Amino acid sequence: MSHRPERVAEAIKKEVADLIRNDIKDPRIGFVTITGVEVTRDLSFAKIFISVMGSDAHRQETLSILQKSAGYMRSEIGRRIKLRHAPELIFKLDTSLDHGTRIAEILHEINSQEAKPTHE
């Protein structure tokens, strides 16, 4: 079995991060972290999972801006990685960090409740 999709996914992750940091000049884009990239076996689609700091409205706005600039990023990726056909980019919000933060908060609450001495 080939590891090419995994290598392409890593290259796409690196290039998209560089494009967001240096080429996309929209001030509405906040602090964006690319948490992962999944590429189909035939390299026709690439799901790019992002985490965005801020409110839900800000996250949706950032996602919309990135999706609108996906065509430009696709052409740049095709040029930089030298693929015959650059995959179509699909941006998705990664909420796993939010879930992890919420679980940590719940565990902290439980620990602080158990640490309180009970008066019996």
From Swiss-Prot:
SUPFAM superfamilies this protein is in?
Ribosome-binding factor A, RbfA
The compartments listed are:
Cytoplasm
**Single annotated GO MF:** ribosomal small subunit binding
Write the record's keywords in alphabetical order, separated by commas: Cytoplasm, Ribosome biogenesis
Q: Which GO CC terms are listed, alphabetically? A: cytosol
Q: Where is this protein primarily located? A: cytoplasm
Q: InterPro entries attached here?
A: KH_dom-like_a/b, RbfA, RbfA_dom_sf, Ribosome-bd_factorA_CS
Report whether RNA-binding shows up as a keyword of the record: no
Which branch of life, at top level?
Bacteria
> Keyword Cytoplasm: yes or no?
yes
Among the GO biological process terms of this entry, one is: maturation of SSU-rRNA
The portions of this protein that span the membrane are none
Task: Family membership, please give it.
Answer: Belongs to the RbfA family.
* Protein's job: One of several proteins that assist in the late maturation steps of the functional core of the 30S ribosomal subunit. Associates with free 30S ribosomal subunits (but not with 30S subunits that are part of 70S ribosomes or polysomes). Required for efficient processing of 16S rRNA. May interact with the 5'-terminal helix region of 16S rRNA.
The record ties this protein, via HAMAP family, to:
RbfA
Q: Which PANTHER family match?
A: RIBOSOME-BINDING FACTOR A, CHLOROPLASTIC-RELATED (PTHR33515:SF1)
**NCBIfam families for this protein:** rbfA (TIGR00082)
| Quaternary structure (record) | Monomer. Binds 30S ribosomal subunits, but not 50S ribosomal subunits or 70S ribosomes.
Give the protein name, as stated in the record: Ribosome-binding factor A
Q: What is the lineage of its organism?
A: Bacteria, Bacillati, Bacillota, Clostridia, Eubacteriales
